[in-house]
Amino acid sequence: MYSGTDNRLDMTFDTFKKIVDDTGSEIFELQLEGGEPLIFPKIYLFIEYAIATGRCAKVIVLTNGIELEKNLRRLVQIHQWYGTEFHIKVSVNYHLLKVHDNHLKTLADLVFATELLPKFNIELNTRKRHNDQWIDAEIDAFGLSEINHSFELQSYGRMTGSNYDGVKIVQNIDSWEIYAVDGKCFGIDLVARSEYEKKLAEEANNEHD
C-alpha cells in the first residue's frame, strides 16, 4: 500500500472478507502490509477470519518491527492455536536504525524467543542506500545474517526518479494478486497500486481540510 504519513485510509472488514471469499475453494496465502499492519486495529480480525476459512496455508506480515515486541505473544498464540504457518518479514533500513536505538538487538531477542517454533519465522528485508554496506555488518554482528535478505532501495513510490533500479518482486508462489485499501485488484503491479493509494489518500485529506 501507499505508506505516506498522510495516509488515513484503512481497509474495511467487509472489503477484506469479500477478497477472501472470492478466492472460492482455493488454498491461499495471506500477506498483510502497510503502512504498518501491526498498528491496524483490525489486523487480528483479518488474520483469524482468513484462517477460519480452513484454506489459509500461510500468514505473512510485512512490518518495520517497531511494534513487533508488543504483538509477538498474540501472533504466536494464534499460530499455535490454529497451526497455521507464519512469516514475519521485518524491514530494516538506515532511518529505522538511526531513530530506534537497539532495534537490531530487540529483533535478535525476538528471533531467539521463537527459534523453537519451526513454522513461525522472522526474516529481515534490508533496503539499503548506496554505501550502506555497514548495515549488513551490523546485522551480522547480531547473528542475523542467515535470516537477512539484503537489497538496494527501489525506484518507485517516494523514490520514483532516483538512481536506483526498478521494482524487484520476490514471491514464493506462482499466482498472487495485490489489492488496494478499497479492494481494487492490481494484479502484481506494485507501482500502480502505490500511485492509486497515494491519490486516494490525497483525496481523503482534501475532504478533511
Where would I find each of the regions flagged by the language model?
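Aromatic-acidic/polar surface patches that form glycan- and anion
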Residues: 9, 39, 178
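Intrinsic disorder/low-complexity signal
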Residues: 28, 35, 206-208
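Radical SAM/AdoMet-radical enzyme domain recognition
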Residues: 13-33, 40-136
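Short, contiguous strand/loop micro-motifs
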Residues: 6, 33-34
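Canonical Radical SAM [4Fe-4S] cluster-binding loop centered on the CxxxCxxC motif
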Residues: 1-14
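Eukaryotic C-terminal
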Residues: 121, 135-150
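Accessory C-terminal segments flanking Radical SAM cores
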Residues: 143-209
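Glycine-centered flexibility motif
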Residues: 4, 129-139, 153-161
